[in-house]
Amino acid sequence: TVLLSAQLPPLASVLIGVGAMLLVMLLSAAHWHSERMPHDTPMLALPHGIVLFIGVLAFVAFLGEGAMLDWSAVFLSDVRRVDASLAGVGYVTFTLTMTVARLFGDALVARVGRQRAIVFGALLAAAGVLVLTLVTPWQASLVGYVLVGLGCANIAPALFSLAGHQTRMPGALAITAVSTLGFAGILAGPALIGFAADHFGLIAAFIGVATALLLVAVSTRWLRV
């Protein structure tokens, strides 16, 4: 968005972004960890029990992220009537906030615990969605995007950590299953929101996302790992 606002061509903006990601990968490659799975470990295992429950929570958490990634600009443009050149500011605000919050997430989770981090994150994200949908000035909507970014930042990592520490399934398989369900949420979620927005409006669809995030916060009482 910043590069496009600076009048760079779309292709140049994409190439710069790809180059930056490749540079980060090369610089971080020396710190990657490798782990070999035992030969008798199945390649695919269906989640069950607590792992399936964690996966469903991950689906909802990623659905919230997907809503911001795919619908934030549409919301500002169509609902708040923001000029198209500024519609991407919500996306940028959300992603930058989530990135910074995720960098400091380990310290937060270590201080409050995984389950409390999920509760606080889900409540904060739900509050952010409600702020950006119910508060009219579009500048105030940016506060909502900040809250959603802060809230969503550490829900998924905490859920992945819970999946790795449970005893119902091997940790590596459980994390794989939970992450698969989670990323299904980030893929299918925006389509579900589009379907809901087509029938009930985008504000109602976003309120549905906030409700789902509140259910994540409530559901953590049944997380016994």
Model-derived regions, located:
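Paired small-residue
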Residues: G128, Q139-L147
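Pair of pore-lining "gating" transmembrane helices in MFS-fold secondary transporters
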Residues: H48-G64, V146-L150
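Helix-to-loop junctions at the C-terminal end of transmembrane segments
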Residues: A101-R114, A197-D198
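Intracellular juxtamembrane helix-capping segments at the cytosolic ends
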Residues: N154-T167
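Structural signature of the two symmetry-related core transmembrane helices
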Residues: R116-V131, I207-A210
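Short amphipathic helix-loop junctions that connect adjacent transmembrane helices
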Residues: D70-L86
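A membrane-interface helix-boundary motif in multi-pass transporters
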Residues: V2-G19, L192-L213
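C-terminal membrane-cytosol helix-exit motif in multi-pass small-molecule transporters
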Residues: V2-A6, S13-P38, S219-R224
